[in-house]
């Protein structure tokens, strides 16, 4: 949904619940 999760995912994973990796940043669903 919302574009920003406040997390980067250079390693390929997001640790914030409800977020997915759109490299290199995490995006919310």
From Swiss-Prot:
Placement of covalent cross-link Cyclopeptide (Gly-Asp): 1-29
One GO-annotated biological process of the protein: defense response
Record note on modification: This is a cyclic peptide.
This protein's record includes keyword Disulfide bond: yes
Disulfide bonds: 5-19, 9-21, 14-26
Stored InterPro entries: Cyclotide (IPR005535), Cyclotide_moebius_CS (IPR012324), Cyclotide_sf (IPR036146)
Pfam families attached to this UniProt entry: Cyclotide
Entry function: Probably participates in a plant defense mechanism.
Protein name according to UniProt: Kalata-B15
